[in-house]
């Protein structure tokens, strides 16, 4: 099967999310109605979202930032939980995965897992509750 052919979200991990959210609001991009102070999301063109995630919340949910972490994550959003499970099985077979969650997990936002590439770049594979993937593979944040 392989992984779905898409990058649907770029997430910037922010030391001062209030300051960065104010900066990005100046772009005039539509902000998701489900944004909260610690996780602000802007809908971009072609089904891609820009997410701002507070450093504190990131560390609480995904672990301490490691040296060399560049302050962003790449995310592949999936149509459903079953696709997340199949993607996890695929990534488990990759050579050189630096770190991989043992299994996908559920949380208040959805279902997914994370892994790091050989240079420490963080990837997420997720099904976000209420999201949609259109016929082109474009992602719409709820």
In which residue ranges do the predicted regions lie?
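Core segments of cupin and vicinal oxygen chelate
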Residues: 11-57
């Amino acid at each position: 099967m392989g992984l779905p052919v898409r990058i649907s979200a770029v997430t910037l991990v922010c030391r001062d999310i209030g300051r960065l959210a104010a900066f990005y609001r100046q772009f005039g991009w539509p902000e998701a109605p489900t944004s909260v102070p610690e996780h602000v999301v802007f809908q971009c063109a072609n089904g891609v979202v820009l997410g701002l995630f507070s450093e504190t919340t990131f560390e609480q949910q995904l672990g301490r930032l490691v040296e060399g972490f560049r302050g962003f994550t790449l995310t592949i959003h999936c149509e459903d939980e079953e696709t997340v499970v199949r993607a996890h099985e695929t990534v488990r077979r990759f050579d050189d995965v630096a770190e991989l969650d043992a299994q996908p997990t559920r949380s208040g936002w959805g279902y997914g897992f994370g892994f790091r590439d050989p240079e420490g770049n963080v990837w997420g594979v997720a099904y976000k509750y209420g999201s949609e993937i259109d016929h082109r593979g474009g992602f719409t944040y709820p």
